Swiss-Prot record:
Top-level taxon of the source organism: Bacteria
Cofactor stoichiometry and binding remark: Binds 2 manganese ions per subunit.
Protein name: Probable cytosol aminopeptidase
Gene Ontology BP annotations: proteolysis
The keyword Metal-binding appears for this protein: yes
HAMAP family documented for this protein: Cytosol_peptidase_M17
EC number: 3.4.11.1, 3.4.11.10
Active-site residues (renumbered): K271, R345
Length: 493
């Protein structure tokens, strides 16, 4: 798939960087073969240097390359990893759409003082996967697609180091696509049982320990919160645990907890039709955790990790749980149910407690939890909450490295008072619509207790209704790369 070479050969296409107000030595060398015509195109603004612009130039036999794709990156001083990701992803999409199977990239043309060749190689391989991802459909009339099968990386840097960076980037991109495919699956095809089977296959592939708790075992452990959500369903619930041992001693364990609600009708607090369509994606947190575990399994960081996925659907029937019910969670805390559509936090409550039972010293939960976070932060920023600023800073640094933006929301004492306000139980699961995202996160904090914890609400970032820089409409695979990067950096400390 990737080859590292020092010189150009015969290629269907070559990708070259263009910065504003600067003609690089790479462009100057090409311009000699074009007898000054490239500089003329630049002077006439027919080769664009604007961010994310792509200009195609046919060689017309002047070189052994058929066509060149010049990628505009804007001003060099404003050049970022986010610009690089978006620009290269768009380029790979373009090559795929134009049915080019063999391409090369002048890697060093994208290198600056801020971004070295290792960074560029990692990002190029990552967005090679992300940008060319195709939505998996079930149409009987399937179109034949031509894929971009080969990318040759031209660089003067050390080949082994570049190959290693390409491998890591590719693993990150491929695992993100795995998560996308899971989230896009129809709910009749991805039940809690099927999700558990997927997780077990992943664990066995990468030699991880695993446990899948059945309903009877959950009852023995007192997982009343997850079981309450499952009451209305004919599909059995699953509590999934994947255990990766990256150190000889079982300590400093990171617990990744992903919400695995395979379909959410809202239960008796029923969603309207428009609010229900798309709820197959309510297991986006579970997919993010499984994607991260795929990366961890491939790259083998020296860090202990537990992945926990509480999984069920949330449907209506004569046996479904109801507003006014009082349930007992695995932690022993009782919960007054005021809203059955606030079910994700109930499942996660038992997931967090189970992660602690298995030895997690740090907790990061990921969930498509609230519409409130979309109102607050929109569809491009993940909401975050924490009880430990040190852990949050580590998550934030990982997210900045992957360009998956997060923003911290507060937890004040009055927020805790609101989730503890119940005449009948220790907690209530839905204090009201105002501050909805904060209330949900604060509720989860009651189960994290003193264990360092970060909550990531991906309700706005888990999917998109239109094509975007890094892929097609549908699931984004958000937080896969951030979680994996967090674990990788923990393992390096």
């Amino acid at each position: 798939m990737f080859q590292v070479q020092t010189e150009l050969a015969n290629h269907g296409a070559v990708i070259v960087a263009l910065f504003e107000e600067e003609t690089s030595r790479f462009v100057q060398e090409l311009d000699k073969a074009f007898e000054g015509q490239l500089q003329g195109l630049l002077d006439e603004k027919e080769l664009s240097t604007k961010k994310k612009s792509i200009s195609k130039v046919h060689s017309l036999g002047k070189t052994n390359v058929k066509r060149y794709y010049f990628v505009g990156l804007g001003k060099k001083e404003a050049y970022t990893t986010e610009t690089l990701r978006a620009s290269l992803s768009k380029t790979f999409k373009t090559l795929q759409a134009e049915k080019i199977q063999d391409a090369a990239i002048l890697l060093d043309s994208f290198v600056t003082e801020k971004l070295d060749a290792i960074d560029v190689a990692h990002i190029a391989a990552e967005v090679y996967c992300l940008g060319t991802y195709r939505l998996q459909t079930y149409k009987t009339d399937k179109k034949e697609h031509v894929e971009l099968e080969k990318l040759v990386v031209i660089t003067a840097e050390d080949a082994k180091e570049i190959e290693a960076a390409l491998t890591v980037g590719y693993v990150h991109g491929r695992a993100t696509n795995s998560a996308r495919t899971l989230v896009n699956m129809p709910p009749n095809m991805l039940t809690a049982t099927k999700l558990a089977e997927y997780a077990v296959e992943l664990a066995e592939k990468y030699d991880m320990d695993y446990k899948v708790l059945e309903k009877e075992e959950m009852e023995e452990l007192g997982m009343g919160a997850l079981l309450a959500v499952n009451q209305g369903s004919t599909e059995p619930p699953k509590m999934i645990a994947l255990i990766y041992k990256g150190k000889e001693e079982w300590k400093d364990v990171i617990g990744l907890i992903g919400k695995g609600i395979t379909y959410d009708t809202g239960g008796y607090s029923l969603k309207p039709r428009d609010g229900m369509v798309g709820m197959k994606g309510d297991m986006g947190g579970a997919a993010a955790v499984l994607g991260a575990m795929e990366i961890i399994g491939e790259l083998r960081p020296e860090q202990n990790v537990i992945a926990i996925i509480p999984s069920t659907d949330n449907v209506v029937s004569g046996t479904a749980f109801k507003p006014d019910d009082v349930i007992t969670s695995m932690s022993g805390k009782t919960i007054e149910v005021l809203n059955t559509d606030a079910e994700g936090r109930l499942a996660l409550a038992d997931g967090i407690t189970y992660a602690k039972k298995l030895g997690a010293n740090y907790l990061v939960d990921v969930a498509t939890l609230t519409g409130g976070v979309i109102v607050a932060l929109g569809n491009h920023t993940t909401g975050a909450m924490t009880n430990n600023e040190t852990l949050f800073e580590q998550v934030l640094e990982a997210s900045m490295e992957t360009d998956e933006r997060i923003w911290q929301l507060p937890i004040f004492e009055r927020d805790k008072e609101r989730v503890r306000n119940s005449k009948f139980a220790d907690l209530n699961n839905s204090p009201g619509r105002d501050g909805h995202a904060v209330m949900a996160g604060t509720f989860l904090g009651e189960f994290a207790e003193d264990t360092p914890w970060v909550h990531l609400d991906i309700a706005g970032t888990s999917d998109t209704t239109s094509t975007h820089d890094l892929g097609p409409a549908g699931a984004t695979g958000v937080m896969v790369r951030t979680l994996a990067t967090l674990v990788e950096r923990f393992g390096e400390e």
